[in-house]
């Protein structure tokens, strides 16, 4: 009986060995075929094809940053900068002191940000292969990718500190990536990318796609924020220069850059100015009507923190005695 079992085991071992060798040999001679033909180089053969690559730099932002409730939970949750819906006090457990976030909560945001970063890297590299009419046309397009890469890394650094800096398309999977310091990321990526975007993005008003004033606003913010990691404060002067240029343009009615401020605060939040708000340096319009992939959540972000003003009778509009502008104020009773 023992010899039979032993013989059977030997047969099984040989069978497994033969199968393993067969699979191994097959993998060595496998020719992959892409029936769609949509490779990065194929798309880059035309300006229209390159546009489809460039469109993907915004996907991570829409999916995990601006317009998604989870990012709001991470940035505002556990603070006093919130209020729940009327008769919806259970949101205290979601955004308030009672919140208990999952340990892997950041994973989705992290993945989506790096998804966006990788598409930015692809768009930057592939731009040199596209038959643009002029160098200016190419730079205006690729400036969008530089801007978005800076935005992704700015949010990652300010929420997580040091992260992995990836400035080129990924060739090999690194299972043990290291972390770059926040200042290195600012100096090697965020600030240079925004400087490029400031130089080449158009002045025209746009939605989702950034304009020159979008890049200038982010550049001033990034240069100022870098002081947190740099005791020499070498980018503070640049932040001041950019901010002053924007202030002067605003005083001139936005003649050069489109920087604008409404005379009355009510106009900032007026429904009529919702889609085309002149004060916005960069705006992104949420999907309307409900679609797949839970994009409908985007349309309800305002409700996460919404509470009817009628529930707070002590909040009223007051008028500034100097400017005449109205603002929200609390009446202490």
What role is predicted for each listed range?
Residues 46-65, 87-160, 175-176, 181-188, ...:
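Conserved, well-structured interaction surfaces
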Residues 25, 129-146, 227-245:
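Secondary-structure transition into beta-strands, especially the periplasmic turns and strand N-termini
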Residues 7-8, 12-35:
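Bacterial Sec-dependent N-terminal signal peptides
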Residues 1-13, 331-332:
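Single conserved hydrophobic/aromatic residue that forms the stacking wall/gate
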Residues 164-169, 198-208, 254-265:
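Glycine- and aromatic-rich loop/turn segments at beta-sheet edges
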Residues 157-158, 164, 205, 225-232:
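Short coil/turn linking the two alpha-helices of tandem helical-hairpin repeats
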Residues 36-39, 97-101, 167-174:
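Short linear capping/connector segments at secondary-structure termini
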Residues 29-88, 194-196, 212-331:
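An aromatic- and glycine-enriched ligand-binding surface/loop that stacks and positions planar moieties
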């Amino acid at each position: 009986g023992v010899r039979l079992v032993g013989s059977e085991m030997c047969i099984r071992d040989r069978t497994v060995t033969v199968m393993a060798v067969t699979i191994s040999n097959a993998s060595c001679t496998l020719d992959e075929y892409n029936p769609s033909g949509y490779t990065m180089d194929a798309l880059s053969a035309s300006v229209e094809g390159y546009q489809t690559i460039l469109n993907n730099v915004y996907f991570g932002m829409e999916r995990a940053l601006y317009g998604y409730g989870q990012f709001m939970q991470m940035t505002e949750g556990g603070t006093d900068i919130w209020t729940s819906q009327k008769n919806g006090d259970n949101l205290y457990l979601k955004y308030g002191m009672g919140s208990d976030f999952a340990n892997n909560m950041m994973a989705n945001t992290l993945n989506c940000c790096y998804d966006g970063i990788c598409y930015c890297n692809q768009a930057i590299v592939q731009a040199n292969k596209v038959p643009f009419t002029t160098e200016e046309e190419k730079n205006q397009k690729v400036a969008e990718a530089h801007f978005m890469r800076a935005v992704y890394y700015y949010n990652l650094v300010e929420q997580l500190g040091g992260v992995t800096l990836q400035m080129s398309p990924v060739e090999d999977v690194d299972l043990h990536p290291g972390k770059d310091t926040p200042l290195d990321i600012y100096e090697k990526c965020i600030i240079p990318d925004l400087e490029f975007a400031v130089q080449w993005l158009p002045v025209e008003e746009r939605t989702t796609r950034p304009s020159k004033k979008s890049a200038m606003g982010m550049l001033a913010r990034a240069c100022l924020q870098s002081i947190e990691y740099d005791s020499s404060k070498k980018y503070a002067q640049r932040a001041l220069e950019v901010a002053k240029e924007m202030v002067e343009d605003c005083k001139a009615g936005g003649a050069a850059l489109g920087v604008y401020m409404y005379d009355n605060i009510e106009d900032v939040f007026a429904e009529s100015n919702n889609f085309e708000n002149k004060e916005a340096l960069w705006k992104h319009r949420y999907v309307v009507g409900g679609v797949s992939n839970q994009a409908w959540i985007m349309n309800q972000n305002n409700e996460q923190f919404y509470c009817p003003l009628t529930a707070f009778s002590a909040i009223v509009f007051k008028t500034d005695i100097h400017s005449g502008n109205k603002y929200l104020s609390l009446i202490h009773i």
